[in-house]
Amino acid sequence: MEALVYTFLLVGTLGIIFFSIFFREPPRLLK
């Protein structure tokens, strides 16, 4: 159970950082 919680927190932090960088700059990769 602890491993699942740690993986969830890791994915959550990476997701927040990714979305913050993605929405901060214009999406140049899609073009």
From Swiss-Prot:
The record's section on Pfam families has: PsbT (PF01405)
| One Gene Ontology term from the biological process aspect of the record | photosynthesis
Cysteine pairings via disulfide bonds: none
Entries under InterPro entries matching the protein: PSII_PsbT (IPR001743), PSII_PsbT_sf (IPR037268)
UniProt keyword list:
Chloroplast, Membrane, Photosynthesis, Photosystem II, Plastid, Thylakoid, Transmembrane, Transmembrane helix
The answer to whether the entry has keyword Amino-acid biosynthesis is no
Query: Where are the bilayer-spanning segments?
Result: 3-23
Q: Which GO terms describe its cellular component?
A: chloroplast thylakoid membrane; photosystem II reaction center
Q: Does the keyword Nucleotide-binding apply?
A: no
The membrane-topology field of this record reads: Single-pass membrane protein
Instruction: Tell me the compartments it is located in.
Output: Plastid, Chloroplast thylakoid membrane
State the similarity comment.
Answer: Belongs to the PsbT family.
The record's HAMAP family line, in alphabetical order, gives:
PSII_PsbT
The role this protein plays is: Found at the monomer-monomer interface of the photosystem II (PS II) dimer, plays a role in assembly and dimerization of PSII. PSII is a light-driven water plastoquinone oxidoreductase, using light energy to abstract electrons from H(2)O, generating a proton gradient subsequently used for ATP formation.
Q: Which PANTHER family match?
A: PHOTOSYSTEM II REACTION CENTER PROTEIN T (PTHR36411:SF2), PTHR36411
The record describes its quaternary structure and partners as:
PSII is composed of 1 copy each of membrane proteins PsbA, PsbB, PsbC, PsbD, PsbE, PsbF, PsbH, PsbI, PsbJ, PsbK, PsbL, PsbM, PsbT, PsbY, PsbZ, Psb30/Ycf12, at least 3 peripheral proteins of the oxygen-evolving complex and a large number of cofactors. It forms dimeric complexes.
Identify this protein by name.
Photosystem II reaction center protein T
What gene name is listed for this protein?
Answer: psbT
